């Protein structure tokens, strides 16, 4: 008996391992795996269905077909275990060994492994320092290669043609060896002395000067180093023994009708064996060379096809013209082993069905059809039936269940009680796509879903299906309940706002009951409490919308100690709102609900409830809100009819005015006063303005109605028009949609994004005519096509993001860094789009924050997690910028620390150790991807047709403050800006910044620093269509190189009669004017050159082409006067890439087409001699050294001679390249740039994503550094290495007093970064599997299984969340004290108990 137990344990034993290493297999190793040589191409005997001896399915090699039974049937049963049958050679054992036992084929001639030959860069080629073309000529028998030159003048590795070879043989007899085919390559590789080759290369690197040679040498050195370190031998890249896959992994299945279905691999193996046997026979017969060569080449080709079909030449096809699936195809791609079987498995105990709405469910429940539940929980039901004695055996229990006896249902009820199930809706774009619920048994066949979780699942009830999964083990049930229960996921992990928010009908009901209307029955009554209101309402004494006074009892909960104090007050409210106050939880102030309940306000209400009262109360409250909303939506009876679409009376008049304007422009165009482009733009402008006017008139018509109030006066009030109610409450529809129903449809876009200038004047109520209908379908069709493409693109972006960030996990509490990002409010066009409080909420402060102007007592100390209370404090103290910790500057060696990450957005307290923040970040950015647009906006599209801004009008009252503004005082008393980066802020009474504006060069500023301004006051203005050149000194103008008709053209304005000069384009000037450069110089009365104040540069201004000078030679100019102006037309026609493509471009760190050119250093600008198509820009820095930049003539240079620029400032207009920002400004500005640009795209679509998610991805893009000076390290110059490796190596060198390596950060796009990860398993399962595995095998890479993906692939718990403790325990047990594991085991890495999750309002340290 003991033996038997041992036997079972033996079978269950798995290898325990800590890492996986991949390397080249030596012939001896392959033979050691093998259980015998496959000699025949036969598979099975088609009459007996038994495998042929020595064939591809041979039982003697691979093991028996039936458990414990040899092939001929001599030995059967367990007692003969381990016996080898002398008749048929089969070992008596389990049949499943056919899945693991390998065979081998001894190749009659060596064969080069195609991966190491053809996968670029060719490893064999690098090793031999030969080109791929040459090696292929040798391999495929087109040329000889010299393997051993002996004393002859021939070179080793020299190629010889047939004739050259014969000549050489005659000349030198047998003094040299040359051969062709894989033998030759094998011989060359075998004879390489790696060590001496290495020394030779290092010497060569030291002496070489050429860049390209250096690159090639570094590559070779790296390869040879890899071979030396990994213990691989170069000749193993050429195979002499071929391993054969176990037969059960390439099955052969008999179909009915005597045919067989077989894996393609069998065909490929058969081909190899046939050719190999034929070659062997030919060699024994000493066949002619040419025949043998041909056979060898065919063998090479068949092995190539087996390993990677189609990599070289045409793919070998089967009977049906379809390429055969080779070993490489088995593992790569979406259907390959990695993505199909290892990362995505099908699971047992699951089912799927259509979903319907369950409005009576509680938030933590879902309705599960009885039939499904019975099937899913079968084993549990069986067990319980047995335990109760209702069935004696499992079989009997099965019968009971099949008959569906009455007691079965009772037991099912018990089994299901408090056993959560997981519901999942595909596509699962973020973690809220799978949530746990407690099942409630229902009749019918559809799953019932709680309406409030629909937003998270993105589900609707038009036929969506959902899958149900049953967590079986106790641990799984615990995790489902504590972490995945729908009640624990009230906040969205993307932005920390509630995601359990009522929508549609519920909003409509709540909005309806909370509206206030004039002069309704019972207005002005006073009630003692809410129950009195309810009685009055039920008895129809008051109407729902009547304005009344009610005495309301409020409970105030202290956020610190939770003390409750109650007080009463009489409140002006309405009957509906008083009824609503009954469902408010204790401690939520009534004024939050005493307003119109639009969707925004409801969201705010739920948010406040969560922050003030915690999880439990909020969940109950959300459910009550839903029930109430549904009830009153039913009572409201809101529905829309065609008469609700009121068309404004003014529409006709507005249209007539617009048509007259368009006609006028048409006439101007015909008389040549405006160009075609201007006409188009102006017409489009007129129509978009008209559209807005009609929309406004329509909203006034629909949104207001005239009523009599209680005093009998007629007043306006918000109307109860059904259409308006729906849009205003946020239940359904928007102003833009109503405008199409009742205003005018307006301008339509063509499929390329440009705008059709004839608008659609009708609306849907009036109906469209044929032309209008056609115009509107034209652009709409593109929209539908886009939607389909968008989903795929968005999914691919998410996949890349998850892959790059999958191993970012919180591994420690604090890494101790003092670095961070400085946060300021985000301002766009003067408006604060994101105030400071929103940006720093949930972040940890990196250094103490003081009151502005007071450095004694910090308001917030370092390492404080800023929650709502702290943020309010900062705002009261009117702090303008805060340095916060960020994952970008986190110094944890693996993963990131909790302090640098800050608050867990979905829970509202500091993030736990083990949280997989990388994946959460990827999901938060990828999930809204489908909402982004796909199109590229062309300027001239309505989307971007904002009228040009030409002044700054402040919106708030306060005082003016200038930031880094350089200005000169004009004679008129105003200031003129002469810097580009100047900004003007308006501060309120507390010194808080309320608005901020950019001041363009040449702006006239009418306010001074510190002036008081009133709201609506204009403080600066400029000409938006011209870029001025402003004089910084007073004097007289002198023209230089102004040659009429050559460099300038005189023009006289027809209307004003004034003369002006326009500078011509240098391309059109002809040869004699090549050296001429038109300059305006300013001189004093005596004609001496003046200099720019505080510099020794002459006051002169180089005039770019197309600039216009209105002054005459010798005219007097004052300080701040405009000398010349450049029309701003051409530089503005850049297309704006928007939406998803823009986000992808930023994450892939692609260089823009015409990137902005940034100043390489700080200094003074001057212009040197131009070359043919380029201008020469020189920056002279403080120590006098100069830096030159050649800039194409067509680019817009936005700096002037003599201007001071700082390093990294834009000197040529364009889109900055992220690589430049990193190189010139560093990591923090790059992070700020990426965050800002990506947020801009999402903000345009109204999607909120927290900055920290983008920062996590940016951190991963900056993982690698480039070595600039190797010092005494093991790295090479120019090598890209993981940052952490360099830091560790440098720390090691410093302790030994050796020179550390110097490095620069490198920015990689997310695809590159994923492929460059340290784990080859993770990279191979992402993209370019062949390349990754080839590279890894050559280096003998070891994968330490640290990321999430690798652990999923090898079938372990992931090292995140609850799995972190398991991994820490494993490492401890195996005696591996990894540095990061010490930090982990020191701190408890367990999931918080449920209790703390529930009351996690406080900041837990």
Swiss-Prot record:
Its cofactor is Mg(2+); Zn(2+). Keywords: DNA-directed RNA polymerase, Magnesium, Metal-binding, Nucleotidyltransferase, Transcription, Transferase, Zinc. DNA-dependent RNA polymerase catalyzes the transcription of DNA into RNA using the four ribonucleoside triphosphates as substrates. This is DNA-directed RNA polymerase subunit beta'. Its EC number is 2.7.7.6. The lineage of its organism: Bacteria, Pseudomonadati, Pseudomonadota, Gammaproteobacteria, Lysobacterales. Signal peptide: none annotated. It comes from Xanthomonas campestris pv. campestris (strain ATCC 33913 / DSM 3586 / NCPPB 528 / LMG 568 / P 25). InterPro entries: DNA-dir_RpoC_beta_prime, DNA-dir_RpoC_beta_prime_bact, RNA_pol_asu, RNA_pol_N, RNA_pol_Rpb1_1, RNA_pol_Rpb1_3, RNA_pol_Rpb1_3_sf, RNA_pol_Rpb1_4. Belongs to the RNA polymerase beta' chain family. Zn(2+) 2 binds at residues 815, 890, 897, 900. Zn(2+) 1 binds at residues 70, 72, 85, 88. PANTHER family: DNA-DIRECTED RNA POLYMERASE, DNA-DIRECTED RNA POLYMERASE SUBUNIT BETA. Mg(2+) binds at residues 460, 462, 464.
